[in-house]
Amino acid sequence: MARLKEIYRNEIAPKLKEELKLSNVMEVPRVTKITLNMGLGEAIGDKKVIEHAVADLEKITGQKPVVTFARKSIAGFKVREGWPIGVKVTLRSDKMYEFLDRLLAISLPRVRDFRGLNAKSFDGRGNYSMGVKEQIIFPEIDYDKIDALRGLDITLTTTARSDDEGRALLRAFKFPFRN
């Protein structure tokens, strides 16, 4: 079992149940999935960009990403319907907790000029989104073998009913919020 999953079950869940004054342990908010998305506008001109992004996300997550396609044509962006424009991965269960552990312990401390995560990036329903400017913060990516620096979006979907519950959950996981 993943280290963070055990910590959640044995320490975080009972503490949150008491803190949020919940009657049942099943009401305690938990992380249900983590979605990593890489939007690749530059893939329009070069098809190799998608292959490199797929390889990078696969190294980071240990899971094969899904290529996303444009839903409709947009002349301003020179995009046609059906063209590949991004890659995404959805992590659940043990892989999700292992990724979260690596993100908090290894990757975030490697971000240049890191002052903490924005505590206001919740969506109103307890889900948290953050952006990473470069994929090289992950130790699985070899700096010498990348073709370009690419950012990615990380979304943590929780069962929390409000932003305050979601914030309490992520603070219990020791998320480094700045404010």
Curated annotation (Swiss-Prot):
Transmembrane segments: none
Record-linked SUPFAM superfamilies: RL5-like (SSF55282)
Matching PANTHER family: 60S RIBOSOMAL PROTEIN L11-RELATED
HAMAP family referenced in this protein's UniProt entry, alphabetically: Ribosomal_uL5_B (MF_01333_B)
Signal peptide: none
The protein's assembly and partners: Part of the 50S ribosomal subunit; part of the 5S rRNA/L5/L18/L25 subcomplex. Contacts the 5S rRNA and the P site tRNA. Forms a bridge to the 30S subunit in the 70S ribosome.
Family listed: Belongs to the universal ribosomal protein uL5 family.
MF annotations from Gene Ontology: rRNA binding; structural constituent of ribosome; tRNA binding
Keywords carried by this UniProt record: Ribonucleoprotein, Ribosomal protein, RNA-binding, rRNA-binding, tRNA-binding
NCBIfam families (alphabetical): PRK00010.1
Record-linked InterPro entries: Ribosomal_uL5, Ribosomal_uL5_bac-type, Ribosomal_uL5_C, Ribosomal_uL5_CS, Ribosomal_uL5_dom_sf, Ribosomal_uL5_N
Official protein name in the record: Large ribosomal subunit protein uL5
Protein role: This is one of the proteins that bind and probably mediate the attachment of the 5S RNA into the large ribosomal subunit, where it forms part of the central protuberance. In the 70S ribosome it contacts protein S13 of the 30S subunit (bridge B1b), connecting the 2 subunits; this bridge is implicated in subunit movement. Contacts the P site tRNA; the 5S rRNA and some of its associated proteins might help stabilize positioning of ribosome-bound tRNAs.
Pfam short name (any one): Ribosomal_L5
BP GO annotations: translation
Lineage top rank: taxon: Bacteria
